[in-house]
């Protein structure tokens, strides 16, 4: 297309894929991030989001991938990174006259301690976020909704990708493997809860479509592979591909959820507020089904996954085998 783009969080797993995908499709991309050594080759902006607000870097499209993502932490840290940070990105996009801002949010905003199937984009209850990360993403989305009403600013598109996986994943799969190695993965409710995953290549595709499709402006989109599966079957497939034995513990979900609440309370008053071994959000995530309806993305963006869950798990296993000492631990 010949347009320019700036991608925040470009030193991260998703951000790096977005940079490479946009460049492969003709965009002149500036990769923005705090760690120069981790940024993709090509034009870069090294600095935090506060510095970006005043940066002299042209962009027709701004993609905001940067975020502090953790089930535990202080509200002030999440607020600065994810709410104030988003405001700084919006400020930058307005100042350089960007036509569109694509914001990568989180389907964590749908989280609840119960099964939720085929969730639509409007089915959000902002009154009861399960942790500070989710609260911060809700605030960031609210900020952008208000901004999208300003005809002088950039058009805003919000994406909510679920369970991003693929070769080089530094978060989702490595966390599971660490638990598996230490004690075995807990199977709550028998591991029957349905899990939606998304190949990182498919998220990058969705970002590009969100940047280009005229009818996407002012809209939020769920993004997944559209292939939900039971947690235990995904775990078995992953470990088999890695050549590891399936080690798990069958535990009563209600008991583990209660213990997690106690651990959160204790860690919350300890010096330094250390992260508890398990949180209620994590327990809820691996206990309950949460699947997303992606019909809006299909109908409006023309989104269709191009990489399957099986292919993503296989590519992770291949990268794992090629890495000294095991997995790509990020």
Tell what function each PLM region has.
Residues 5-25:
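N-terminal Rossmann NAD(P)H-binding glycine-rich loop of SDR-like oxidoreductase domains
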Residues 292-300, 304-330:
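Amphipathic terminal alpha-helices
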Residues 209-277, 294, 314-317, 327-329:
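Mid/C-terminal beta-alpha module of Rossmann-like enzyme folds, strongest
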Residues 46-84, 88, 92, 112:
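NAD(P)H-binding glycine-rich loop region in Rossmannoid oxidoreductase-like domains
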Residues 166, 188-193, 221-228, 239-242, ...:
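Glycine-rich Rossmann NAD(P)(H)-binding loop
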Residues 139, 170-175, 189-211, 218-222:
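Substrate-positioning beta->alpha
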Residues 88-132:
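Conserved Rossmann-fold NAD(P)-dependent oxidoreductase catalytic core, especially the SDR/UDP-sugar
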């Amino acid at each position: 297309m010949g347009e320019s783009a700036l991608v925040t969080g470009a030193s991260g797993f998703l951000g790096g894929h977005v940079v490479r995908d946009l460049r492969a499709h003709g965009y002149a991309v500036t990769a923005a991030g705090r760690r120069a050594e981790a940024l993709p080759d090509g034009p870069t902006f090294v600095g935090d989001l506060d510095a970006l607000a005043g940066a002299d870097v042209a962009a027709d499209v701004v993609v905001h991938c940067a975020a502090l993502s953790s089930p535990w932490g202080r509200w002030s840290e999440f607020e600065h990174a994810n709410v104030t940070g988003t405001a700084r990105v919006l400020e930058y996009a307005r100042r350089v006259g960007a036509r569109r801002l694509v914001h990568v949010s989180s389907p964590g905003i749908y989280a609840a301690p119960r099964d939720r199937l085929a969730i639509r984009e409007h089915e959000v209850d902002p009154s009861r976020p399960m942790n500070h990360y989710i609260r911060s993403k809700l605030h960031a989305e609210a900020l952008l909704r208000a901004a999208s009403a300003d005809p002088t600013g950039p058009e805003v598109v919000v994406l909510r990708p679920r369970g991003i996986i693929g070769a080089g994943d530094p978060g989702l799969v490595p966390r599971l493997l660490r638990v598996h190695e230490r004690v075995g993965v807990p199977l709550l409710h028998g591991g029957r809860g349905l899990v939606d995953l998304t190949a990182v290549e498919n998220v990058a595709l969705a970002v590009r479509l969100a940047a280009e499709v005229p009818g996407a402006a002012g809209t939020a989109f769920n993004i997944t592979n559209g292939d939900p599966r039971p947690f235990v079957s995904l775990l078995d497939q992953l470990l088999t591909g890695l050549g590891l034995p399936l080690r798990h513990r069958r535990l009563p979900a209600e008991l583990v959820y209660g213990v997690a609440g106690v651990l959160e309370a204790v860690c919350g008053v300890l010096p330094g507020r250390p992260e508890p071994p398990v949180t209620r959000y994590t327990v809820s995530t691996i206990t309950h089904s949460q699947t997303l309806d992606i019909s809006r993305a299909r109908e409006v963006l023309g989104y269709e996954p191009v990489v399957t869950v099986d292919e993503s798990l296989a590519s992770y296993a291949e990268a794992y085998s090629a890495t000294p000492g095991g997995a790509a631990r990020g």
